[in-house]
Amino acid sequence: MSVEPPPELEEKAASEPEAGAMPEKRAGAQAAGSTWLQGFGRPSVYHAAIVIFLEFFAWGLLTTPMLTVLHETFSQHTFLMNGLIQGVKGLLSFLSAPLIGALSDVWGRKPFLLGTVFFTCFPIPLMRISPWWYFAMISVSGVFSVTFSVIFAYVADVTQEHERSTAYGWVSATFAASLVSSPAIGAYLSASYGDSLVVLVATVVALLDICFILVAVPESLPEKMRPVSWGAQISWKQADPFASLKKVGKDSTVLLICITVFLSYLPEAGQYSSFFLYLRQVIGFGSVKIAAFIAMVGILSIVAQTAFLSILMRSLGNKNTVLLGLGFQMLQLAWYGFGSQAWMMWAAGTVAAMSSITFPAISALVSRNAESDQQGVAQGIITGIRGLCNGLGPALYGFIFYMFHVELTELGPKLNSNNVPLQGAVIPGPPFLFGACIVLMSFLVALFIPEYSKASGVQKHSNSSSGSLTNTPERGSDEDIEPLLQDSSIWELSSFEEPGNQCTEL
């Protein structure tokens, strides 16, 4: 992906206009560009929540049709192909997230919210037009599938430090809420009217989300934080997907947190990519039961990430809340691995809902251990780790299913049918048990994370620094804008020494 200077910048280089004409031209350009950036009201967490809700509601509608199309397209090695498709998408997201983040720090959040939602939802109508193109576009759409990253930057722009823990929890809960009813609605429409109508409704919802961003969402990044010219230089170090990972070893606390995130999110990413197929193939869930299961877990996750998270953070503390979430994750993965009956899946689903507190708690822990002007780098590291897991996790789970000969040989087996494979196996779900072992290692690593620490020795950005945003004005003291990813030459993570006040998640 290349970033070329806009035509007006090249014209400026060819013939420099008079000095007195520059402010007038610049003001006119800013006035023209500010019209579509205004939206309705002041930027808030509610705008971000609606964008997330609509995007994942559209994809939730396609849960049942997607399982059918996946089986029809890849009748052999279904789990493996699903893992590879999702793995390619995740790796592309990991590679593109820093560039999109750096550009959003320059040009604002709204243009990139619009772009990420559009390209993420672009494959939806292709499901009925051409399944092969649909899966190909899903893989390629990973380049822009970083809506959550831009949303988190948007939320950080509009909240104070002490509000971010709650705000991240609400955004994560909104994601869960979008999956409460959409799979059930999609399953009903599919059974009553066919998959074509489901795809049409999902496409309409995606278009509604795009229109909402275009018309209603205001820009969250203040104009004075953006460069005067849209042709401002961007350091390519900001676009390096491995730049944030290189900072991990510079501080022991950051290293421990990142290892914890990697070991906990790797099995979670794999689980998200294959679990609905697993419920249908191994356990024998039909479309209605899968939709009901998603709704139950979604509702409980909302309660866990809103009410329970706040209570646990106050009573147990940040670190112990993370440990509790990892404990729930371990239990639910082991239960999925050994469970062979439907009731076991329902019981494990309640535990899975409680494990959803882990990522918001980790986000709060990261923010708590970083100074206010280091938030972009600290959260950027976590974003990079999760992006890497989104690529590796699905491929890992697909490979393990393939190694243990778990295939989608029959679509929608009847519950308690003798044809359902692995019902009598000692370990019906090998990838989930493997994931539980990985989370156990994550739990052991998290034990060594200090409860309180604060970064110090921050190296501030100088206006004379080369390769950075030379036209970006200084930050006002009354504003706390958190960039998605910062240039490694701007911020350096130093050793965490002094305890400080608490501040702060698809």
Curated annotation (Swiss-Prot):
GO CC list: membrane
Name this protein carries in UniProt: Hippocampus abundant transcript-like protein 1
Region Disordered, residue ranges: 1-25, 457-481
Signal peptide limits: none
Family, similarity comment: Belongs to the major facilitator superfamily.
Keywords: Glycoprotein, Membrane, Transmembrane, Transmembrane helix, Transport
Residue stretches of biased makeup (Polar residues): 459-474
Organism superkingdom: Eukaryota
Glycan attachment points: 463
